Amino acid sequence: MTFQTLSSENNELLTIASESFLKRWAFSEQRLTVDLMTSDDDELTVYIETDLVQSSPIYLNEDLNICRLSIQDMHEILAVQHGYYVPPSRFGDLMKYSSECYSFFYGRKSDFKYLASFIGYEKYIACPIRFLEDISWRIR
């Protein structure tokens, strides 16, 4: 089994994980490990180097655990001042962004460019990453 790395030239993972079942996840030593079952019944493990994870519970009903991997460029969403992300000034946007897990970028250096999320019935797991290459995966 070889590991592959996500990059702007290699976004195969986004296709593979477009409709997967979230089986389990763990966060240890600054590494998020997410185990998924793909629509082709392959076991997919995604590794993300990060320092912070926000999560929701995995449901007992597996049908509710269908998800996809989403990568968002936070430079396109949040304003940056003096090298740090700042919250929006409008209260409505502030509340909307909090529900999207953008709030843990507030006050963080803008070198954390991306938000990686596993989204389905709800946003199951979200974490900030510096580079796309901080995400690797393998299929078994």
Curated annotation (Swiss-Prot):
Task: State what the entry records as the consequence of deleting this gene.
Answer: A double rhsC-rhsIC deletion is not outcompeted by wild-type cells.
Function recorded in the entry: Putative immunity protein component of a toxin-immunity protein module, which may function as a cellular contact-dependent growth inhibition (CDI) system. Blocks the toxic effects of expression of the C-terminus (residues 1519-1658) of cognate toxin RhsC in E.coli.
What is the protein name for this chain? Immunity protein RhsIC
What organism does the UniProt record list as the source? Dickeya dadantii (strain 3937)
